[in-house]
């Protein structure tokens, strides 16, 4: 049974599958409307941005270890 979601823009039903290339949006139009909302800063992420002070030393070391495993051209 396919998963059905509501288009974030127009609320119409969208099947979450490869046959819906703009998922979770129902169309390219709704996808672009949403992009415009973000570009005009009408949408925001509700959680506060985490400051570096909120990271423990262990977390920082874990992130650095993961980054060290990437190829040298990862950030280019």
From Swiss-Prot:
Key words of the record: Metal-binding, Zinc
Cofactor(s) listed in the protein's UniProt record: Zn(2+)
GO BP annotations, alphabetical order: regulation of DNA-templated transcription
Binding of Zn(2+), residues: 7, 10, 26, 30
SUPFAM superfamilies per record: Glucocorticoid receptor-like (DNA-binding domain)
Domain of life, source organism: Bacteria
InterPro entries (alphabetical): DNA_gyrase_inhibitor_YacG, Znf_NHR/GATA
Cofactor note: Binds 1 zinc ion.
Keyword Phosphoprotein: no
UniProt-listed Pfam families: YacG
One example GO MF annotation: DNA topoisomerase type II (double strand cut, ATP-hydrolyzing) inhibitor activity
Protein's job: Inhibits all the catalytic activities of DNA gyrase by preventing its interaction with DNA. Acts by binding directly to the C-terminal domain of GyrB, which probably disrupts DNA binding by the gyrase.
Subunit structure: Interacts with GyrB.
Family assignment from sequence similarity: Belongs to the DNA gyrase inhibitor YacG family.
Protein name from the UniProt record: DNA gyrase inhibitor YacG
């Amino acid at each position: 049974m396919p998963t059905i979601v509501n288009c974030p823009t127009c609320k119409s039903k969208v099947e979450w599958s490869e046959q819906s290339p703009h998922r979770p949006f129902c169309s390219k139009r709704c996808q672009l409307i949403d992009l415009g909302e973000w570009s005009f800063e009408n949408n925001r992420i509700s959680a506060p941005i985490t400051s570096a002070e909120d990271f423990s030393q262990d977390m920082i070391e874990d992130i650095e270890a993961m980054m060290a495993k990437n190829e040298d051209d990862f950030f280019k």
